[in-house]
Amino acid sequence: MRVADFHFDLPEALIARHPLPERRASRLLALDGPTGSLAHKQFADLLDYLRPGDLMVFNNTRVIPARLFGQKESGGKLEVLVERVLDQHRVLAHVRASKAPKPGTRILVEGGGSAEMLQRHDALFELAFAEPVLPLLERVGHMPLPPYIDRPDDAADRERYQTVYAQRAGAVAAPTAGLHFDEALLEAIRAKGVDTAFVTLHVGAGTFQPVRVERIEDHVMHREWLEVGQDVVDAVAACRARGGRVVAVGTTSVRSLESAARDGELKPFSGDTDIFIYPGRPFHVVDALVTNFHLPESTLLMLVSAFAGYPETMAAYAAAVEQGYRFFSYGDAMFITRNPAPRGPED
């Protein structure tokens, strides 16, 4: 399969650079996987597509203010984007500077704080901060908005680039399908008889990396840490027993569940995943999906195509562009039911 098969033209004006005033004010494009039919709705209409007995699985990762500005002790300016917190003081980070820091380099953080560069791991730098890193980031860090938002973060992003159910700090990008849910909608979902469960996948900056190969089979996925607990395994089993559907909120929830069921059976799992889901790969757990609109030629668009079918997905995206839907992290959403016989671009 060619990466170019997943290209579509997206007008710049459709990239959402700010959130709407209300979380649930977004639009919702519903795609019925088995038939390919589309329905244009509001996000609050998601309730109409859920059934009593369904199970919704959310990713409860919490975005950390992972971007730091500062300078080397010698004077050169730099920017740090934390990729992964290793322990109370150490992180792996991307560092942008005119000259890459060498081991032993001391970094002075804008707003207070310092770190030492310990060693390099390919594209990432291992840094040790003089004080506990999570409180430091909360104090002086900036929210790591995606590159396509193309503006400095502001105070509103601290709240809006975060789900209302975020619990476990560690992500450097939001699980954006969850941004549409407010407390009132979550209460209405539970009141309808829909169960909820939470996985954790700490979304890394690699989620924004372009696919740099021509054939998608040659692409190597970035690694992210996830945890699927026994409580989630039990909730999925109970859902299956009562005839309900497993509805994943976001591609990160899909990747978590399918990583924990790689041999076909869902089991508790804690560790790194590099799962790459593209057309032809089976789904063992997820029956329906809530997701935002993704970048052209991205691995997330490939995942959606694997779930809904390639022609159905690309037709839905063409309709979304024509109808002026807002794209990417702060944009609109889709509700998709799984296509039982999905076709790829070469079928």
UniProtKB/Swiss-Prot annotation:
Q: Which domain of life is it from?
A: Bacteria
Which HAMAP family does this one have? QueA
Q: Name one GO biological process term.
A: queuosine biosynthetic process
Cellular localisation? Cytoplasm
The name of this protein is S-adenosylmethionine:tRNA ribosyltransferase-isomerase
Q: Name one GO cellular component term.
A: cytoplasm
Enumerate the catalysed reactions. Answer: 7-aminomethyl-7-carbaguanosine(34) in tRNA + S-adenosyl-L-methionine = epoxyqueuosine(34) in tRNA + adenine + L-methionine + 2 H(+)
Q: What does this protein do?
A: Transfers and isomerizes the ribose moiety from AdoMet to the 7-aminomethyl group of 7-deazaguanine (preQ1-tRNA) to give epoxyqueuosine (oQ-tRNA).
Subunit and interaction comment: Monomer.
